[in-house]
Each structure stands twice: as structure tokens, then as C-alpha cells.
Amino acid sequence: MQVSIACTEQNLRSRSSEDRLCGPRPGPGGGNGGPVGGGHGNPPGGGGLGSKSRTAVVPRPPAPAGALRESTGRGTGMKYRNLGKSGLRVSCLGLGTWVTFGSQISDETAEDLLTVAYEHGVNLFDTAEVYAAGKAERTLGNILKSKGWRRSSYVITTKIFWGGQAETERGLSRKHIIEGLQGSLDRLQLEYVDIVFANRSDPSSPMEEIVRAMTYVINQGLALYWGTSRWSAAEIMEAYSMARQFNLIPPVCEQAENHFFQREKVEMQLPELYHKIGVGSVTWSPLACSLITSKYDGQVPDACKATVKGYQWLKEKVQSEDGKKQQARVTDLLPIAHQLGCTVAQLAIAWCLRSEGVSSVLLGVSSAEQLMEHLGSLQVLGQLTPQTVMEIDALLGNKSHSKK
């Protein structure tokens, strides 16, 4: 099916940082588990709403065009936004589990991070079947079960694509979407996830099959919404058109890499999809895998992320000419950060949050100190005036421009 769209598809010339780090995809370990306590019941499926009628309908005034409704949590200061144009409210900062849960940090540290995040208003926790070969999901599930938080008080997202070594254990076939999600639920010890993401596009699976399978898992109560991750704008539009053609459920969100040096997709392509079809954005890697921290100066210090096993690509990036240029730009941003009374990491995260259509930014941290620093970016967001953003753009020299 050919779909025309004004969005410019991003040219992916190299593998993303997640691809490089994950490397060959090992199969997830098995896992037993039952429903988490807390009194929640099965989520509603995709059926009708019943026959009750209302005597009068009072239309609500429309929201400002392109505006994400934002509110602030009582006692925490956390800000909440709608996930795209859906009704789901998510914290504008979420906690990711990539390369940390089940691998880089201990289970005790993982529990501390989840607790600190939850107590500071974070309600969005993201994982994937491939993270640490399933151990990240298992660790997250064990913590949630031990904490006993109300299931209705947080949002769990997982991603499906790379499951195991067998041909039928990866990709976006109907078989793997259903069985992969069931495996994730077993490891998470949950009855459902709030959002299931297709963790990349799959040219070997027909789009209709993908959309029908996602609709099926939602109708079966295994997920409440579905989204995409690292899909092109054209692919997302095709999925939406397929859903509308066959009365299926369209995606509500795209997960995309976004930081000072990765801008075009989130700034130029996804806002158009947000306005046209209501697809929101959840972004990841706001610090470019720690490159935007001012800790590197063409060198790789001891005990930094670039020295961790599996991060050889980051070490090479830091020492490359392109990496050195990016580090120079980070150094140039330090005066702006000092003027705002924040760290360059806080500035970078707040900068990501200001993009149109972005519902949440996922944080990847390995200590409570890092998490608290990153949560402080919310105070910086209000200080990002148009003038400040223009100064940042001038220093970066890579602002995306419309081709209209």
C-alpha cells in the first residue's frame, strides 16, 4: 500500500545506539509470574461501551492547536502531559531500563531508582523484551510486585521485536507480537502493559498483519495502547491509514532518539504527524549516551560509561573527530547552563521537553544522585525562553529547517 505524506523520511545511514549496544539478540530467559497485587482488575478490552445514552451532550471548548495539556502534580512538582492526543496522562519524565536494570546495576539499586522516581511523581516506566535478554523486565516486575503500588497509578511500556534466536521469536509477525507480549507479561508479573511498542519496523511483515495483531492484543486486554519505536514518518502514516481502512486501532505514540545532535525527526517530522493523526512522541537518550555531560574532553576518563563492557562504540565516538566537535559544542553550552543555574545535563533534558508534541523524555540513570539531578531539569524548562533557545541553536549550528 502506497501512502503519500509531506513528512520527510529521515535517512538512517547508521545503526542507532541501541542497535550497536544490543548487538546479537539473545533469547530472553523464561519466567513465571502471576498478577500483581493491588486490587486491579482486568483492563477493558476493545469492545463497545454499552447502550447507555445521555440526555444532553455539552461540547468542550477545543484545546489550543498543537498544545499538549500540561498539569503539575501536587507535592512533587512533576509535570504531566497527554500521550499524543490520547487520554493517557504520563509524567513528562519517565524512567528507562535499557542497559541498567538486570545488567549494569544491582537489583537493590534498581529498586532505589524506581522508588525515588515514583515518589517524585514519575509514573512512566519503560522496558523491552530484549533488554538484558529479559532480565530487565523480570527485575522491574519483581520490584513492582514487592512495592505493592496501585496498578492504576503507573504506566508500564514494553517493546517487542527481538525475542529469541529462533526465526519465529523475533520480528513483528502476528505470532511474535502475541507470544512476545505474553512472555513480557510473564516476566513483568502483570496482567497487561499500558503501551506495547513495535521496537523497529519489520519489512518482512505486512503492515496489515502488524496492525491487526496490535489491535488483537489490545482487544484481549494484554495492552491498552500500542505505539512504534524508530519507525519512519511514512511507516507510521501507513499504519494509521491501515487502521482507518479496516476499522482497527492506530498507534498513539512514536519512541524516537532525540538530543542536541539528533534533531530532525522530532522537530520536523513528528510534529506534523501529531497535528495530522494525533501521534505523540516519547524520546530517549537525551544525553546522547552520556556524551552530553561535559565529562569528556576528547579523552575517556576512568569509570565512565565509555569504559563499560559493550560500550566500545561510545569510546570510539568520543575519540572520533565528529565526537570531539560535539564535545566542543557541549563546552560552548556551559555558560548558558551556568547562567540558568543548572548543569548541562539538566539543560539538555529541558531542551528536549520543549519540542512540540513530546509527551515524555525517558531517563537512563545508574544512581539516585543522577536521577535527582535529571529530575531537576523540570525547573530549567520554565527558564527556556525563546531567546535562550535561539542562543542554543546558534551554538549548536544544526537547527532543522522546513523544506517548504
From Swiss-Prot:
Binding site for NADP(+): 97-98, 104, 126, 199, 229-230, 255, 284-289, 295, 305, 364, 366, 370, 373
Keyword annotations of the record: Cytoplasm, Ion channel, Ion transport, NADP, Oxidoreductase, Potassium, Potassium transport, Transport, Voltage-gated channel
Highest rank taxon of the organism: Eukaryota
Family matches, as SUPFAM superfamilies: NAD(P)-linked oxidoreductase (SSF51430)
Region (Disordered): 1-78
Biased composition (Gly residues): 28-50
InterPro entries hit by this protein: K_chnl_volt-dep_bsu_KCNAB, K_chnl_volt-dep_bsu_KCNAB-rel, K_chnl_volt-dep_bsu_KCNAB3, NADP_OxRdtase_dom, NADP_OxRdtase_dom_sf
GO biological process, one term: regulation of potassium ion transmembrane transport
Catalytic machinery residues: 131
Principal place of residence: cytoplasm
Enzyme class, spelled out: oxidoreductase
Listed GO CC annotations: cytoplasm; voltage-gated potassium channel complex
Expression across tissues: Predominantly expressed in brain. Strongest expression in olfactory bulb and thalamic nuclei. Not detected in heart, spleen, lung, liver, skeletal muscle, kidney and testis.
Subcellular location, record wording: Cytoplasm
GO molecular function: aldo-keto reductase (NADPH) activity; potassium channel regulator activity; transmembrane transporter binding; voltage-gated potassium channel activity
E.C. number: 1.1.1.-
Compositionally biased spans, kind Polar residues: 1-14
Sequence similarity: Belongs to the shaker potassium channel beta subunit family.
Quaternary assembly: Forms heteromultimeric complex with alpha subunits. Interacts with KCNA5 and KCNB2.
Summary of the function given for this chain in its UniProt record: Regulatory subunit of the voltage-gated potassium (Kv) channels composed of pore-forming and potassium-conducting alpha subunits and of regulatory beta subunits. The beta-3/KCNAB3 subunit may mediate closure of potassium channels. Inactivates Kv1.4/KCNA4 alpha subunit-containing Kv channel current but not Kv1.1/KCNA1 or Kv1.5/KCNA5 channels. May display nicotinamide adenine dinucleotide phosphate (NADPH)-dependent aldoketoreductase activity. The binding of oxidized and reduced NADP(H) cofactors may be required for the regulation of potassium channel activity.
Annotated protein name in UniProt: Voltage-gated potassium channel subunit beta-3
Originating organism: Rattus norvegicus (Rat)
